[in-house]
Amino acid sequence: MSELNTKTPPAANQASDPEEKGKPGSIKKAEEEEEIDIDLTAPETEKAALAIQGKFRRFQKRKKDSSS
């Protein structure tokens, strides 16, 4: 499932004729983003945030140490 789809060329969904690109009906409407409601006071959210912050701090420290 993590494999990239190599069968479809990258420009397959783009209009090939430059005149078609300007037409309003030729461009597909972007899929609306799904709004996700996250409970910021939940213990699971706090635990995940602390884990992400810790990893980011370690990354920044390693980045700083390697550039010195």
UniProtKB/Swiss-Prot annotation:
The keyword Phosphoprotein applies. InterPro entries: Calmodulin_Regulator_PCP4-like (IPR052142). The keyword Phosphoprotein applies. The modification Phosphothreonine is found at residue 8. Residues 18-31 have a biased composition (Basic and acidic residues). PANTHER family: IG-LIKE DOMAIN-CONTAINING PROTEIN (PTHR15359), PURKINJE CELL PROTEIN 4-LIKE PROTEIN 1 (PTHR15359:SF5). This is Purkinje cell protein 4-like protein 1. It comes from Mus musculus.
